[in-house]
């Protein structure tokens, strides 16, 4: 009997208990006692990740939709109430009585009572997508895997998280197999035309996204996240293809209008030959859908390959 008891104790002690903390943005945070049941997503791509994990029934709000104006007008995004056009005021956020708030960009969390530390002090768990953490690495697909793994554990959806990771890897592998052969197509990414020709340099996610699709970012050699160039610089690079972000504040249609009507930009090869691709803004963020996005880009770029 004594031996049986000792074996039972040894077995219990040898079984690892669920850690009482989780790691995010290089810090340890208190893990919730139970799976979150009132989740708020700040930024559309953060909501997309949660929805992909199957957390929709537990989501009580989403704010800051980037490319879905219809959902904002309807007041619901894939069944989740839209609580603010941009980031919600503190009273609006707290009124949702959230037990988990997930942000897509660092700006999602303020400096006051909506900061991560103040929210934690009020018993609200927070998570910031790893690609938005200060000083993050450039392993964007690794960030997606990490987001899925940690949030999958917090939500009790580990199997779903693993399935999403495997699906992303499969899509990335397939994208590489169908990418155009030969010299990679040069692509200029136009993020916004509001304050100039805003794009991304080598540190932005567009660079590895295009690489996965068999192309190269013409600004990859610039060691910055955000880059604004002038017309003359773009003309000198004369990219094979132009990628246009479609966002509520900067629609792809408006970018096309600029490119086709501007006396300088209209002379670009990609504009003259209509080798321009519209893509929803949120698909240009690192999310579980990034493998599928790279695969679709590879297919489109293959059809635009220069002989």
Can you name each region flagged by the protein language model?
Residues 89-103, 230-247:
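Proline-aspartate-enriched helix->loop->beta-strand connector
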Residues 20, 33, 111, 115-193, ...:
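Extracytoplasmic substrate-binding proteins
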Residues 107-121, 241-260:
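A ligand-binding cleft/hinge motif common to bilobed small-molecule-binding domains
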Residues 4-13:
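Sec-dependent N-terminal signal peptides
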């Amino acid at each position: 009997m004594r031996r049986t008891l000792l074996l039972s104790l040894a077995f219990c002690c040898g079984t690892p208990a669920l850690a009482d903390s989780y790691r995010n943005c290089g810090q340890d945070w208190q893990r919730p006692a139970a799976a979150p049941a009132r989740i708020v997503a700040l930024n559309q791509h953060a909501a997309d990740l949660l929805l992909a994990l199957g957390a929709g029934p537990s989501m009580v709000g989403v704010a800051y939709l980037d490319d879905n104006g219809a959902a904002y007008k309807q007041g619901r995004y894939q069944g989740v109430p839209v609580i603010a056009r941009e980031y919600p005021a503190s009273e609006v956020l707290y009124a949702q009585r959230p037990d988990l708030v997930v942000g897509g960009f660092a700006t999602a969390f303020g400096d006051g009572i909506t900061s991560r530390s103040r929210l934690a002090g009020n018993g609200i768990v927070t998570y910031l997508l790893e690609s938005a953490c200060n000083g993050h690495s450039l392993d964007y697909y690794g960030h997606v895997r990490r987001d899925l793994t940690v949030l999958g554990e917090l939500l009790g959806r580990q199997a779903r998280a693993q399935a999403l990771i495997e699906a992303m890897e499969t899509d990335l592998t397939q994208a590489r197999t169908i990418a155009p052969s030969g010299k990679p197509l040069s692509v200029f990414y136009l993020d916004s035309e509001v304050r100039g020709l805003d794009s991304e340099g080598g540190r932005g996610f567009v660079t590895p996204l295009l690489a996965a699709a068999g192309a190269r970012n013409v600004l990859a050699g610039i060691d910055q996240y955000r880059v604004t160039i002038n017309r003359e610089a773009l003309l000198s690079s004369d990219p094979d293809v132009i990628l246009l972000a479609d966002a509520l504040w900067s629609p792809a249609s408006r970018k096309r209008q600029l490119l086709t009507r501007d006396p300088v930009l209209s002379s670009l090869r990609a504009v003259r030959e209509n080798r321009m691709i519209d893509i929803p803004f949120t698909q240009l963020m690192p999310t579980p859908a990034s493998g599928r996005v790279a695969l679709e880009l590879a297919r489109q770029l293959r059809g635009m390959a220069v002989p």
